[in-house]
Amino acid sequence: MRKTLDIDLSPEEYFTPAMMLQAVARKAGLQSGDVKHVEVLRRSLDSRRGIRYHTTVEVYCNEDYTPRDFRGHYQDCHTKAAVIIVGAGPAGLFAALRALEVGLKPIIIERGQPVEQRRLDIAQLGRTRQVNPESNWCFGEGGAGTYSDGKLYTRSTKRGNIDYVLQRFIEHGADPAIAIDAHAHIGTDKLSGIIANMRRTIEDHGGEYHFSTCVSDLIVEREGAQLTVKGVRDTAGNTYSGNAVILATGHSARDIYRLFANKGWMMEAKPFALGVRVEHPQSLINEIQYHRSPAMRFLPPAAYSLTTQVEGHGVFSFCMCPGGVIVPAATAEGQQVVNGMSNSKRNSPYANSGIAVTVGLEDVPQYANEGALALLRFQQEVEQAVYQAAGNTISAPIQRLTDFCQSRPSQSNNKSNYLGPTVNCPIHQLLPPFVVRCLQQGLQLFDRKMHGFYTAQASVLAVESRTSSPVRIPRDETMQHPQLRRLYPCGEGAGYAGGIVSSALDGINAINALQPLIPLPNHGL
């Protein structure tokens, strides 16, 4: 017999198997000896009033437990109809895995390098401070998500089957605990191996990868009054043909936006967010969030999620990394961009998070003549200005949080876990005035929710500008571009996702949308 129940457990009860067994048996009205197994289905940590794990468990009473099978069901697609997937980030990879399930051969075109070489290129960036524009913290196998902590949660459950995404990660090497955590993460140190395992699955079942291959154009044919995409062309002149093209190039592939602009294909400006990355001692965040509880020894490094409104703008935390580091995330020379990541153990002494301000067309009327690329142009100019302020290097401008909020230069700065040099800068003078005002007020308002957040122990680093794409490539109800049939814009780069899980689901949905066009056996999902 099995019984599912919800139970609140103290950290000590949760992490001590005998205590958990007793608590669950008591809640279920059973004797401890009758419980053969307790399977945790869901857990979330609540530290608001005392520290408790809200837990959903399945109790096996006098019945043996059979572990879940997380394996996918992939077809041999070596000789099947092909679909071109531009980009090997989460949207592209999960589109490829889903393609194998439904009987399509995925051909993945990736501008960057496999994760093994990408790791070496990033190490080279750390030594030389020179950005490789095709292989960096954003570009390469796995996309930007490979180096962003591997957070696996999304606010929306309407996009698709989140458990399916988690199962594919577990199948390829992720800790099965991601299937139960309300705020699951994998860790940058684990993700590269998982991404490589996904590549092996895709190639073993007939998929192809073309690395160091940058798409320069779409192959478009006119069929009556309709334009239909037949494939892509790369910068070397090679062509790749398929039954459809999934465009999953990520939020930093600015050359794709320029291609669309030059061709006159439909795009639109999309609101995005821009700000700074805030860094605190992790011990301070733990004390604030866990209220100096004796149970802290059982608990993971504390996280936070903050949001407020200032002058009609949203101000919010983004990509919060407990026990993390800050990385130089520029994709070309002449840019300064920061992002955060953390490894699976989240054991750095620092916590960091983007704190960003929403930006819309109404905020930048001076760029109106740029049309769909108005916000992209604004984003570029801010990144260039910060780069110049840092001495034309990828050194990160840094300032004490309290000094930033009071519009005064810092006389000295805190230590930072930025993977590169920092330079003392008055960041309040570098960013657009409306962004600075919103950040200054928002950071102080956050102290009302997390007393101690506003402190001279914290630093701000600039600039957090790649929160999402400032451009949307539109699509209709079939997920195709309105002008270009059989082109499926998806993921963050098309403006339809924001994070690993939502991007993965968008890639899956793009493949599902192909099925009315190409006769395929339906399998699952």
Task: Identify the meaning behind each predicted range.
Residues R2-Y53, V57-Y147, K151, R155-L525:
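Residues forming the flavin
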